């Protein structure tokens, strides 16, 4: 009993349990090759090692159900039953009539193996491969003893290690990754490490084999390879073209899946390939896989997913195809280059299959594919793709600008600026205070929403003429932008009635007989959303010439001018100047002297205020217009984008329809309110 407790205490001191001493592999296939190279074999060469030596199978490998790999030989399973034993010697007397079939895997001439020692068969009921032991000495599967005529089913998995008569062999399936038992793996890797240390000592003490000619750019002291690696490199240079021909369809390439995947990815200048492109590259360069219908594609997918040397990368936007693309991991390449520069890559076995292909590519091309350019191009494309629709919209807006009106005054064009709707409140003049959300100071640039400026553009009261106004502001002469119009500013000619636009943007005609605003008079048009004036500033602004307005009315008795500040600088006011809400009962008859009495100090203009309410006194400015905020609301809320007070000019003439309607109401109100008119009507009725 005490011995049972002592044995576990000694095990941690054994080198088998020291994982730090075991070599590591990035490619699973390299690990399998390392394990196979350390499998035990008798001192006397067996017949199977001579008949199925790796040197012979390297050019004659064929499609098979499975393969059984020994230390230096490989047998391919082409039937559902494989016999293992010892064949009869050829020198034996042949006078007997008893004929025995030949053994598939001949482990002779050692007598420890029976003539019919074991068999590997496929169990159709359980759908698995199994080992049946027939010889008296039995066999082992992953170190576990299997006796003769065992009633249990000894199933074989991919990576199982068999031991029969002192000869170890590994059973490997083509469609399943090989999994080695942990206990067997530790033993094999320790042997592998010892073999590599002895081999390195022999190479360093001898003259040295040196690297192939393709590694001249590196130090030969760090490129000592085993003969197997040299033969693999020579095969890569000599058999690539031959293996792609149709007559080589029965020759399996001597490369692992990771090697072929790396070759395919490195063939792309950007180092990026999709899964289908990897399939096509392998099928085009190796006829064996082109004509093979087995699940080698599944093995490719497994290697891509499980191998840390490969990583996914998304496709570019609008790139045809589905799924992700694959590339060699940036961290893996960085680690590889660091090992190259430090000279530590030779301390490992030979590097993984991916590292070997990177070394070959680096030696022949002096650089690795720059896959980071693919991701950079993708990021640039994502950044610029969003700006392309905005540029197209701006170009379309330039092409859709209305033609300029022909008139004696300078041609004033109306640029198509996109004006977002103002958030309305119960008080129509209650603007949300924002500081200069629209920057119109530079007229040469197209309007860009939400571009703020620091200093608002203000009118100078010394400017008297339109030419001086626009030249000083840096705007081309003869062009004035007006994104939003007042109802009184609509003066359409007969030609404009037929081609009436459906959007709220207007292109009014310009008239010559525009009366100038008298000094000392202040019109409510001087207040807009783009400027904020105090009472003293309004007096200074009264000197501005009304000929600089975008649109004027043809009525000689009313001045319906509107400053062009909306097109120049569209900003919310910081201080609201009160405007009077005009109703039929509260007209402008109390303002005959031409001055504007703004009685609405509490900003009582609501959405019920109509544009055609109020009166106009001849000789003074027209103060009967609604607030700009209310007109903005009407413009952007009507379904067809038209003014709700507009009529065809054929009914009321070429004058402003709003003014005609107001003049009509003024006449009616004058007749109703005049005491003389009332007396006349009373006398007529009495008579």
Curated annotation (Swiss-Prot):
Its main location: nucleus. Residues 82-146 form the FHA domain. This is Fork-head transcriptional regulator 2. Transcription factor required for the morphogenesis of true hyphal as well as yeast cells. Contributes to virulence. One of its GO terms (molecular function) is DNA-binding transcription factor activity, RNA polymerase II-specific. The keyword Methyltransferase does not apply. The gene is FKH2. Induction: Induced during host epithelium infection. Expression is positively regulated by CDC28. Keywords: DNA-binding, Nucleus, Transcription, Transcription regulation, Virulence. Residues 252-350 bind DNA. It comes from Candida albicans (strain SC5314 / ATCC MYA-2876) (Yeast). Residues 1-23, 226-246, 385-449, 472-569, 584-687 are annotated as: Disordered. Residues 226-241, 411-442, 491-540, 625-659 have a biased composition (Polar residues). One of its GO terms (cellular component) is nucleus. PANTHER family: CHECKPOINT SUPPRESSOR 1-LIKE, ISOFORM A-RELATED, FORK HEAD PROTEIN HOMOLOG 2. Disruption phenotype: Forms constitutive pseudohyphae. Impairs ability to damage human epithelial or human endothelial cells in vitro. The keyword Transcription applies. One of its GO terms (biological process) is regulation of transcription by RNA polymerase II. A motif (Nuclear localization signal) lies at residues 663-670. Pfam families: FHA, Forkhead. SUPFAM superfamilies: SMAD/FHA domain, Winged helix' DNA-binding domain. It is found in: Nucleus. InterPro entries: FHA_dom (IPR000253), Fork_head_dom (IPR001766), SMAD_FHA_dom_sf (IPR008984), TF_fork_head_CS_1 (IPR018122), TF_fork_head_CS_2 (IPR030456), WH-like_DNA-bd_sf (IPR036388), WH_DNA-bd_sf (IPR036390). Residues 389-410, 472-490, 542-563, 589-624 have a biased composition (Low complexity).
């Amino acid at each position: 009993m005490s011995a049972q407790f002592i044995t576990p205490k000694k095990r941690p001191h054994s080198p088998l349990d020291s994982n730090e001493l075991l070599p590591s592999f990035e490619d699973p296939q390299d690990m399998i090759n390392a394990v196979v190279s350390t499998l035990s074999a008798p001192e006397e060469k067996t017949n199977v090692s001579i008949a199925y030596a790796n040197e012979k199978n390297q050019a004659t490998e064929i499609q098979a159900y499975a393969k059984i790999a020994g230390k230096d030989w490989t047998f391919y399973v082409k039937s559902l039953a494989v016999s293992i034993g010892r064949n009869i010697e050829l020198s034996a007397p042949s006078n007997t009539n008893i004929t025995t079939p030949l053994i598939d895997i001949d482990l002779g001439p050692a007598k420890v193996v029976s003539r019919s020692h074991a068999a590997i068969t496929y169990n159709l009921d359980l759908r698995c491969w199994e080992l049946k032991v027939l010889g008296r000495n039995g066999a082992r599967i992953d170190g576990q003893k299997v006796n003769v005529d065992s009633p249990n089913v000894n199933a074989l998995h991919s990576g199982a290690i068999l031991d029969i008569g002192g000869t170890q062999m590994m059973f490997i399936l083509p469609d399943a990754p090989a999994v080695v038992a942990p206990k067997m793996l530790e033993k094999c890797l320790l042997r592998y490490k010892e073999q590599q240390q002895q081999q390195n000592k022999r190479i360093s003490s001898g003259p040295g084999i040196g690297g192939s000619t393709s590694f001249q750019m590196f130090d030969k002291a760090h490129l000592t390879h085993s003969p197997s690696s040299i033969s693999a490199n020579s095969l890569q240079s000599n058999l690539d073209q031959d293996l792609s021909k149709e007559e080589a369809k029965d020759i399996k390439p001597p490369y692992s899946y990771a090697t072929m995947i790396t070759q395919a990815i490195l063939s792309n200048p950007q180092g990026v390939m999709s899964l289908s492109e990897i399939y096509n590259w392998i099928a085009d360069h190796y006829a064996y896989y082109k004509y093979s219908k087995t699940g080698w594609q599944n093995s490719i997918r497994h290697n891509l997913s499980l191998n840390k040397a490969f990583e996914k990368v998304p496709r570019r936007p609008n790139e045809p195809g589905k799924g992700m693309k694959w590339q060699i991991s940036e961290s893996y390449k960085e680690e590889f280059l660091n090992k190259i520069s430090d000279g530590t890559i030779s301390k490992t076995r030979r590097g993984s299959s991916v590292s070997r292909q990177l070394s070959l590519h680096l030696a022949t091309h002096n650089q690795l594919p720059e896959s980071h350019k693919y991701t950079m191009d993708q990021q640039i494309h994502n950044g610029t793709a969003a700006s392309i629709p905005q540029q197209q919209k701006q170009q379309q807006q330039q092409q859709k600008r209305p033609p300029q009106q022909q008139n004696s005054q300078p041609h004033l064009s109306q640029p198509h600026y996109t004006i977002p709707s103002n958030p309305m409140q119960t008080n129509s003049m209650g603007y949300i205070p924002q500081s200069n959300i629209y920057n119109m100071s530079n007229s040469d640039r197209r309007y860009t929403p939400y571009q703020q400026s620091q200093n608002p553009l203000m009118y100078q009261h010394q400017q008297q003429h339109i030419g001086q106004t626009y030249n000083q502001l840096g705007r081309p002469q003869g062009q004035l932008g007006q994104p939003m119009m007042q109802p009184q500013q609509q003066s359409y000619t007969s030609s404009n009635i037929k081609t009436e636009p459906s959007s709220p943007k207007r292109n009014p005609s310009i008239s010559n007989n525009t009366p100038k605003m008298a000094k000392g008079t202040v019109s409510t048009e001087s207040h807009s959303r783009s400027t904020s004036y105090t009472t003293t500033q309004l007096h200074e602004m009264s000197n501005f010439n009304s000929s600089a307005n975008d649109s004027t009315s043809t009525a000689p008795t009313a001045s319906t001018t509107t400053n062009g500040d909306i097109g120049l600088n569209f900003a919310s006011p910081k201080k609201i100047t009160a405007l009077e809400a005009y109703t039929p009962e509260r007209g402008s008859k109390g303002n005959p002297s031409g001055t504007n009495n703004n009685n609405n100090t509490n900003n009582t203009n609501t959405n019920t205020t109509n544009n055609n309410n109020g009166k106009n006194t001849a000789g003074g400015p027209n103060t009967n217009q609604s607030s700009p905020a209310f007109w903005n609301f009407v413009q952007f809320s009507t379904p067809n984008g038209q003014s709700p007070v507009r009529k065809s000019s054929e009914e009321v003439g070429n004058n402003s329809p709003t003014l005609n309607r107001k003049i009509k109401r003024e006449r009616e109100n004058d007749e109703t309110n005049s005491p003389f008119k009332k007396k006349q009507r009373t006398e007529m009725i009495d008579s």
